[in-house]
Amino acid sequence: MYAIIETGGKQVKVEEGQEIYIEKLDAEAGESVNFDKVVLVGGDDVKVGSPYVEGASVTAKVEKHGRGKKIIVFKMKAKKNYRRKQGHRQPYTKVVIEKINA
């Protein structure tokens, strides 16, 4: 069984036991979180929500928080001596999907 959930402005396909990296959540490591915005539940019979499947939820456990690889944002205007270098690391949360309730 699989589900498509909406979190952090993105849609993610999840299955039980899967580890996923999502946008940072306000939850401590080891805490259990519940995703109510389930767009689709698949398996033997597929349930498609409009916009969300009623009564469906996905339970996950927060494993850790972290920051992604550093990316460099470099702005430059030729012949004008304009240079700006800025780094960015996106925060993320690693969760393990425990149960899909459909």
Swiss-Prot record:
<dbReference type="GO" id="GO:0005840">
    <property type="term" value="C:ribosome"/>
</dbReference>
<dbReference type="Pfam" id="PF00829">
    <property type="entry name" value="Ribosomal_L21p"/>
</dbReference>
<comment type="subunit">
    <text>Part of the 50S ribosomal subunit. Contacts protein L20.</text>
</comment>
<dbReference type="InterPro" id="IPR018258">
    <property type="entry name" value="Ribosomal_bL21_CS"/>
</dbReference>
<dbReference type="InterPro" id="IPR028909">
    <property type="entry name" value="bL21-like"/>
</dbReference>
<dbReference type="InterPro" id="IPR036164">
    <property type="entry name" value="bL21-like_sf"/>
</dbReference>
<dbReference type="InterPro" id="IPR001787">
    <property type="entry name" value="Ribosomal_bL21"/>
</dbReference>
<protein>
    <recommendedName>
        <fullName>Large ribosomal subunit protein bL21</fullName>
    </recommendedName>
</protein>
<dbReference type="GO" id="GO:0006412">
    <property type="term" value="P:translation"/>
</dbReference>
<dbReference type="GO" id="GO:0003735">
    <property type="term" value="F:structural constituent of ribosome"/>
</dbReference>
<dbReference type="GO" id="GO:0019843">
    <property type="term" value="F:rRNA binding"/>
</dbReference>
<keyword id="KW-0687">Ribonucleoprotein</keyword>
<keyword id="KW-0694">RNA-binding</keyword>
<comment type="function">
    <text>This protein binds to 23S rRNA in the presence of protein L20.</text>
</comment>
<keyword id="KW-0699">rRNA-binding</keyword>
<dbReference type="GO" id="GO:1990904">
    <property type="term" value="C:ribonucleoprotein complex"/>
</dbReference>
<comment type="similarity">
    <text>Belongs to the bacterial ribosomal protein bL21 family.</text>
</comment>
<keyword id="KW-0689">Ribosomal protein</keyword>
<dbReference type="GO" id="GO:0005737">
    <property type="term" value="C:cytoplasm"/>
</dbReference>
